[in-house]
Amino acid sequence: KELDELNEVHGSFGFPVIVKPRSEGSSVGMARAENFEGLRRAVLAALDHDPFVLVERFVKGTEVHVGLLDGRVLGAIEIVPKSGIYDYASKYTPGATEYITPPRLPSTRVRGVMNLAERAARALGCSGACRVDVLVTEGENEYVLEVNTLPGMTPTSLLPKIASSAGIDYPALCEAILDGATLHGSLGVSRRDSRISHVTVAADAAFESDDLE
C-alpha cells in the first residue's frame, strides 16, 4: 500500500535521490534513482535489507572523509568513484575508486571540513575511532552525510588510509584504538555512555558549518 502511494509521498522532493536501507553498512542496498520508476525499484531492493528505507536528496559535490581518534582529527581523504556514486561496487572493486590525500581543495577549505567533522563527532558524543563523511559543494556549503563510529578497519579501509597519510601505520593505529578503549574503561565509561552507534542524516537536513557551535 505504501509503495502505491510512493509518488504522492515523494511529492516535489525532486530527483535524483539516494535510496538506502536504514541499518546496512558498506552501502549495501544503496542506489541512485533518477525518476519515480527508478525510485520504486530502489525502494523495493532496499526493503530486502531493512523494513525502513531512507530517501535522501542527491547533492553534487566533493566527498571528503575525515578520520578521528578520541576526538583528534587524523586527516582527510577525497573519494572519487569512477561510477559517480560511492556504492558497494565502488568500495570493493579494485581500481573503481580514486583515493586522494590530501583532498584537492583549498587548504582553508580542508581545515574547515576537518573542523566541522570534529565538531560533529563531539556534538554526538563519539569516542574512540570514528569517520565523518562530508560533502563539499561548489558554493559555501559543507554537509555532514554520516558519522560512522564503526569504520572499516581492514588495512585498506578508509580510516587506516587516513592514518597512514598522517604517519600512523596499521599496527600503531590498532594499538592506539586499544589504548583509548582501555583508558575509557579505567574512567568508568560504559558502552551505554557512548550515545551514538551509527547516524545517517539526509543531505537536505544535514549539519552545515554554522549549525554546530
What are these regions (language model features)?
Residues E2, N35-G38, D169:
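Short loop/turn segments at beta->alpha junctions
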Residues P106-E213:
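ATP-dependent carboxylate activation and anion-phosphoryl transfer catalytic cores
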Residues L3-H10:
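A short helix/loop element that forms part of the nucleotide-sugar donor recognition site in Leloir-type
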Residues K1, S27-A33:
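Flexible, glycine/proline-enriched loop segments at strand-loop-helix junctions
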Residues H10-V28, P51-K60, V64:
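ATP-grasp fold ATP-binding core
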Residues E34-N115, V136-Y143:
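Phosphate-binding site of ATP-dependent enzymes
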Residues S27, E98-I100, P155-L159:
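Short small-residue beta-strand/loop micro-motif enriched in glycine and branched aliphatics
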